[in-house]
Amino acid sequence: MRRMEGRPVIEIVGVPMDLGGNRRGVDMGPSGIRYSGLVTKLSEIGFRVRDRGNIHVADPDEGLATHAYKRVDAERMFKGPRAHNVTEIVRACEELASVVADIARAGNIPLVLGGDHSMAMGTLAGLARAGKRPGVIWIDAHGDINTPETTPSGNVHGMPFAVALGLAGDPFPADLRGTTSGQHGVLLGLRDVDPGERDNIKKAGVTALTMADIDRLGLGPAMERAIAVAGKGDGIHLSLDMDALDPDEAPGVGTPVRGGLTYREAQLAMEMLAASGKLRSVEIAEVNPILDESNRTAALAVELVASALDETIL
């Protein structure tokens, strides 16, 4: 075991939420990742670990309201299915933001376990509340940069990066919006992007590296570029959607897309982040144990987290 002296504490918080997509089961992701030995693995590589448990995620049937607007008000703002379950998602993200802010203010590393990717709004808002404006490396098959106006589905897990970049307005509250800058943002591993997202990527000035770019450049040069861009922020935040990997590597995700990162490519990306010394926070999204095979995807998530954090902030 490596020495723990001088290393920050890693504080884990789970977000058992599947309200942002249209397939159930992602809410069990935090349990699946923990079951795969996350705390033991991080302890073995020399970190002190504190697990804060899970935040509460309300069921839509509870009829809760947030930020002085009721569900009916949000539904009246737009015609059609523009932001499903937004009230409960916002409430969960606000609670997550409060926890992440406490962790970051203490100088520790937030490690957020999902849960669907809409939770990223809360993670980045929490960092902002703590005075942190990190660059973001968003590794994902999808852009997650739709707004309520551009979304074809109304699924909020396709909107969190747009909200964090300030591209989305109502029904998302102001304190979740504009928490990071497109100049320091990178999308890596893209292979399924909606038409409206293409425009939003350009509008925000985000650096986008598709799987075609990775095939052409190689993962190493692509990741070097990502770190160079995101590293200009206040450290780097890693937002890793497990569907960035090829379904042969990570079958337990809700929106699999063929042609993703290989195991070795994903490991190299994490190793390069560790070597950069700039990683300050991590979230793992979209692990779905119901769709997994013998918890393979959750176990892989543990490996990748360990690789990303192994040599960070010595």
Where are these regions (language model features)?
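A general structural motif
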Residues: 168-169, 186-194, 220-222, 262-267
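Catalytic cores of soluble, metal-dependent hydrolases
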Residues: 2-17, 23-111, 123, 129, ...
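Solvent-exposed alpha-helices and their adjacent loops that cap or buttress functional pockets
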Residues: 3-6, 128-131, 153-154, 176-180, ...
